[in-house]
Amino acid sequence: MMTSSSSLAPRPVLGAGPVLSKAVLSAASRLGLRSRHLALVIGSSEASISRLQHGRALDPASKEGELALLFLRVYRSLDALVGGDDEKARVWFNTLNDHVAGVPAERVRTVEGLVDVVQYLDAVRGRL
């Protein structure tokens, strides 16, 4: 039985940009972040976040994309630490934490704070 070469061609895969956009919007929603707050986290504007919500893709190599990837690391690490419990994650994210020198939700609004929170969560996960 012969197979045409077109049936052997790889299927197109969803690009990294749309996947990153969808993931960062989902993580922000699960942590209770509003568009304005997410815009600060990824160094963007509220209008840009609105465009993301309507299908615009983030370029992973852009400044916004790199910050979005760091924010996803925060979410993924926190999700693993709380066993997938979004309510516990939201409580942790919005509670004063001496180890990150503030409230994580506020700290992630700056690049330095975002990196500090990522490093803290990575260290905590590393001890488990």
Segments predicted by a language model, with ranges:
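Non-transmembrane "mature" sequence context
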Residues: 1-128
